[in-house]
Curated annotation (Swiss-Prot):
WD repeats lie at residues 79-110, 138-169, 180-210, 226-257. The gene is CRN1. The keyword Phosphoprotein applies. This is Coronin-like protein. Disulfide bonds: none annotated. One of its GO terms (cellular component) is actin cortical patch. Pfam families: DUF1899, WD40, WD40_4. It comes from Saccharomyces cerevisiae (strain ATCC 204508 / S288c) (Baker's yeast). Belongs to the WD repeat coronin family. Present with 2900 molecules/cell in log phase SD medium. Residues 427-451, 523-540, 547-572 have a biased composition (Basic and acidic residues). One of its GO terms (molecular function) is actin filament binding.
Length: 651
């Protein structure tokens, strides 16, 4: 994903660490139900786990601090008549939790203030089960997933086997909004501001809904594999991440523009491996890190998300596979130990193992760069306000510094990101830095140079006509040719287009001069000087200013040498500087080449110097033409995409 080179990132050394055995939760009875859910949920104070209970469905709630072995008889949250499939904590009430069940009901539960998992018993020593506060009814089939709203309190989303997603006012118990799907929803995720909901269903399609309008904003095919898919909204952005499978059962990750799913995933699917377990995605908005937890394996991969690309950071490996995983809110991490994620995984359906991820730093001060403000437990809206149409830009944020200092928490409203996230801006950013985030190997570069993408006819015609127009308007080549002609006249050179440079007796001497044209570091041409054919046409193209200045500086020196050259002895001393100037470099001729150059006749030297200059110009012009061609093709590609976008917006 990021190639085999080392990226500069402050999260490059993030590592995962499992808790010691004495800090784990043991002797648990995790459900063996095959329904695809995370099995665990946590709010940083409690852990909810779907329980393998008889006589109807139930789940257990474990306070974080009550580690160790569970007693034989534990208090359970009972009330459903069938298996509990999913749970979710209220983000604005640490003692409120919702559950979805196979009995088509949604249970709302309150955790008692004095609740203890190990010692919540009556006078006879029997565990006291907790009853639901209310049931929400309205689904016709099992409720597979429940999810609380991130901004408004008492707003709950639920997906069911009746192919619908319902939005509930928990306080009144009414289903206010129903989003109908053609198949069962397997995963859903709210946007940062809570106005949109992303869903993936068994029809293999990804959808983004404007919830209160009950309309699909964007829709398109996602992963092609037969197994369930997952979706997560990537924080305060308009990007989504999905996990799924290809037709060949490769596990994949996809990045999407939430409001333009039709154009496909951004940059192609990332192939992870060929394991059979579903990848559970968790996104950390504060650090821009996407964690992928494999269901049925012990690996947790994590990637940094930047500029619509994922860059692999590392992988937490374990020999003990997990079926369930839960992540605590960011405000619950250990700030003093530079913990960036607090997670919990199930192990062999009998144990819950805490897993934390850390940024290794020695400083004992507050690390402000890795701890931006995080969502708090304060709601930004009430249920009535949200259902009536009121919106905010995001949840109420709490300062992580206040948590570090132990002072009174400071809150403020979330704001939209400063960078514009429109499609045009995203395309421009990717065009300006195409090789910084996803570098291309040398072999791929060679393939691209040999067989570039064939542009559309419109693009090709536009680019060629643009280049021709630019070349016709540019008069710099005429000036350069005039300078070259003046130099030839100064050195008494013959016109190379005329066949008058026959061999003379003086030309029969052995060891002719061999002048090589040095190539500047930016040039990719061969070192040897190619032959110049009289019939070759030079395409007009701007040449670097540095070359012009060097040639202008060489002119007065050569004029003086030609005026003072009265005898062969004086001409011998003037020849090496002029040949070096013609080569436009600072490389000095060797002592062996100087005598042979001095023995060459003035006429042949002048001709060779003009050939040398023309050869250098040809190489430079070819290089500039290549660069101009590439730049114009890139420009036309951007213009074409802009036109397509304008056309879509105008419809």
């Amino acid at each position: 994903m990021s190639g085999k080179f080392v990226r500069a990132s402050k999260y490059r050394h993030v590592f995962g660490q499992a808790a010691k055995k004495e800090l784990q939760y043991e002797k648990l009875k995790v459900t063996n139900n095959a329904w695809d859910s995370n099995l665990l949920k946590t709010n940083g104070k409690f852990i909810a786990v779907n329980w393998n209970a008889s006589g109807g469905g139930a789940f257990a709630v474990i306070p974080i601090e009550e580690v160790g072995k569970a007693p034989d008889q534990v208090p359970l949250f009972r009330g459903h008549t069938a298996q509990v499939l999913d749970t979710d904590f209220d983000p604005f009430n640490d003692h409120r939790i919702a559950s979805g069940s196979d009995d088509s009901k949604i249970g709302i539960w309150d955790i008692p203030e004095n609740y203890k998992f190990h010692d919540h018993v009556d006078e006879d020593g029997e565990p006291i089960d907790i009853k639901p506060v209310k049931f929400l009814t309205g689904h016709a089939r099992k409720v597979g997933h429940v999810l609380y709203h991130p901004v408004a309190e008492n707003v709950l989303a639920s997906s069911s086997g009746d192919y619908t997603v319902k939005l509930w006012n928990v306080e009144t118990g009414k289903d206010m909004i129903t989003l109908k799907h053609p198949d069962m929803v397997t995963s859903m995720s709210f946007s940062y501001d809570g106005n949109y909901l992303a869903t993936v269903a068994r029809d293999k399609k990804l959808r983004v809904w404007n919830i209160r309008e009950e309309k699909i904003v964007s829709e398109g095919p996602a992963h092609t594999g037969a197994k369930n898919q997952r979706v997560v909204w990537l924080g305060n952005s308009d990007r989504l991440a999905t996990t799924g499978f290809s037709k060949l059962s490769d596990r994949q990750i996809g990045i999407w523009d939430a409001f333009n799913i039709e154009k496909g995933d951004l940059g192609g699917f990332y192939t992870v491996d060929q394991s059979s377990g579903i990848l559970m995605p968790f996104y950390d908005e504060g650090n821009k890190i996407l964690y992928l937890v494999g269901k049925g394996d012990g690996n947790i991969r994590y990637y940094e998300f930047q500029n619509d690309e994922l860059f692999e950071l590392s992988e937490f490996q374990s020999t003990e596979a997990q079926r369930g995983f839960a992540v605590a809110p960011k405000r619950m991490v250990n700030v003093k130990e530079n913990e960036v994620l607090k997670g919990f995984k199930t192990v062999v359906d009998q144990r819950i193992e805490p897993v934390s991820f850390f940024v290794p730093r020695r400083s004992e001060e507050f690390q402000e760069d890795i701890y931006p403000d995080a969502p708090s437990n304060k709601p930004a809206l009430t249920a009535e306000e949200w259902f009536s149409g009121k919106s905010v830009e995001g949840p109420i944020l709490v300062s992580m510094r206040s948590i570090y200092d132990g002072s009174a928490p400071s809150f403020h409203e979330a704001k939209r990101p400063q960078q514009p996230t429109t499609q045009e801006t995203a395309l421009e950013e990717k065009k300006e830095q195409p090789k910084v985030e996803k570098p291309i190997s040398e072999s791929e570069k060679e393939v691209k140079q040999e067989a570039p993408k064939s542009p559309s006819p419109l693009k090709s015609a536009s680019s060629s006509s643009t280049i021709n127009h630019v070349l016709k308007e540019d008069n710099s080549i005429n000036k350069l040719l005039k300078k070259s002609s003046d130099i030839d006249q100064v050195n008494n050179a013959e016109d190379p287009s005329r066949d008058t440079s026959g061999w003379e007796e003086a030309d029969d001497e052995p060891a002719p001069i061999k002048i090589e044209t040095p190539v500047t570091p930016t040039e990719t041409k061969k070192d040897r000087t190619p032959k110049v054919e009289p019939s070759k046409e030079l395409k007009p193209e701007p040449v670097s200013i540095a070359t012009d200045r060097k040639q202008e500086q060489s002119l007065p020196q050569e004029e003086k040498s030609s005026e003072k050259t009265k005898s062969p002895e004086q001409e011998k001393s003037a020849t090496p500087p002029s040949s070096i100037t013609a080569a436009k470099t600072a490389i000095t001729a060797s002592s062996k080449e100087e005598p042979s150059a001095a023995r060459t006749s003035p006429k042949s030297l002048g001709l060779k110097k003009s050939v040398e200059k023309l050869s250098t110009l040809v190489l430079q012009l070819e290089d500039v033409v290549d660069k101009l061609t590439k730049a114009n093709l890139d420009k036309d590609e951007r213009l074409l995409k802009l036109e397509q976008k304008i056309g879509e917006l105008s419809k």
